[in-house]
Amino acid sequence: MGDRPRRNCGTRRRRHNELFDALPVRLFSATGRGPIEVLVRWDGERFVEMPGHVATIDDAPETGRFEVNARAYGLMQTLCDLVENGAVLTFDYGYPQEELWAPFRTTGTLLAFYKHTAHEDPYIHVGEQDLTTHVNFSELQAAAEESGMDVAGLVSQSEFLYCVGLGQVVEQARGEMGEYFTRRRALEQLTDGAGLGRIRVLAATRGVEGEPPGFEGCQ
């Protein structure tokens, strides 16, 4: 993306879905001396963890484990700098920093998915499973604002889709029951509060008057 021109002319909309939660992260463990990075080595039979150096991290949790996504801030700025007039829409699992690093979240958010089953051991099925962490939306908002963007959100994907009128799209198919039930099942899946509906949506806009579609009255 670094080879692309900055601030493309015209109105642009850039949407990305679950981009930031797929980036590599650094894992830390809070101690009385400060956060210590959790490193990994091979002991000849398996991957094992080992303590790294004490790090300085602003507002770091005082207990438990947490992740830092070192690439998210710069990537968000790169995306924003590609837009002269328009919006960057971010769809991802995550929280504002105060929720992400809340005291009760002592094990962090690192998860592994193997054959569509979630578990918490990233050191098995190496190369055969997906690893993911929740996104720090406070960091993405700060990056967008530093790039001169206006920020709207956070809202849930469920709120966003209903606000842009997806419910009406379903109702428009009532005259054709097969299509109606297909659309309704899709809407239920996308807005399920225990699943995809929990995805958060953040909008960063430039040259857009008022709140962007999907965010009016939803915050």
Go through each PLM region and give its residues.
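Short, flexible loop/hinge motifs at secondary-structure junctions
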Residues: 1-3
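A short SAM/SAH-binding and catalytic strip from SAM-dependent methyltransferases
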Residues: 5, 9-32, 65-70, 74, ...
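A generic structural signal for well-ordered coil/turn residues at beta-strand boundaries
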Residues: 10, 34-36, 198
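A mobile, often basic/glycine-rich helix-loop segment
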Residues: 15-61, 103-114
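Long, Lys/Arg- and hydrophobic-enriched amphipathic alpha-helices
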Residues: 52-219
